[in-house]
């Protein structure tokens, strides 16, 4: 059950709805099904269940906003990665109405071609309102960054 709470952010208050894992999973299923769907009409139906009308998927150079643009993004995924599927491959880290998730692009052979993370933000009605996917590894710290404020290199990076 969603629990409403008011969080004060500076001079304004923002109504934030707390969501639990079952609410995220219930809405992520049609979202991932939409990414697997080749039929544009059925894909739009799935997107309407999973996302708000003005929902956005952000990218490094473009924001896909609304059902038509998100569907266009999915069509591009099918063109650029034929036979591949976008799948959920981690549990959820939930902060009120946002969750950090892991996804993978899986080929016909079942092997992961790419892995990434995303921040999924749900609207008060429980549907997705924003997705911020990250497929790239973190870049190294700039050489100019103060040494006393820098941590050790992360595992799996080119610096480690």
Where are the predicted features?
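A beta-strand edge to alpha-helix "cap/lid" segment located at domain peripheries
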Residues: 20, 77-160
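Short acidic-aromatic low-complexity motifs
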Residues: 19-50
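Conserved N-terminal glycine/acidic-rich loop preference
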Residues: 31, 35, 47, 51, ...
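A solvent-exposed, acidic/Ser-Thr-rich amphipathic alpha-helical stretch
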Residues: 41-98
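Acidic, Ala/Val/Gly-enriched low-complexity intrinsically disordered segments
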Residues: 2, 16-17
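Short, flexible active-site loop motifs that bind/organize anionic cofactors or intermediates
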Residues: 14, 37, 60, 118
């Amino acid at each position: 059950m969603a629990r409403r709470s008011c969080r004060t952010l500076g001079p304004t208050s923002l109504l934030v709805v707390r969501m639990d894992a079952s609410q995220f999973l219930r809405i992520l299923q049609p979202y991932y099904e939409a990414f697997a769907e080749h039929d544009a009409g059925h894909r739009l139906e799935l997107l309407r269940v999973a996302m708000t009308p003005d929902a956005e998927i952000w990218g490094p150079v473009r924001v896909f906003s609304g059902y038509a643009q998100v569907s266009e993004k999915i069509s591009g995924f099918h063109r650029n990665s034929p036979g591949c599927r976008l799948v959920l491959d981690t549990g959820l880290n939930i902060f009120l109405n946002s969750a950090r998730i892991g996804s993978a692009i899986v080929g016909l052979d079942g092997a992961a071609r790419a892995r990434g993370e995303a921040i999924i933000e749900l609207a008060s009605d429980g549907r997705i309102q924003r997705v911020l996917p990250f497929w790239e590894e973190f870049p190294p710290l700039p050489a100019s960054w103060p040494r006393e404020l820098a941590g050790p290199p992360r595992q799996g990076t080119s610096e480690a």
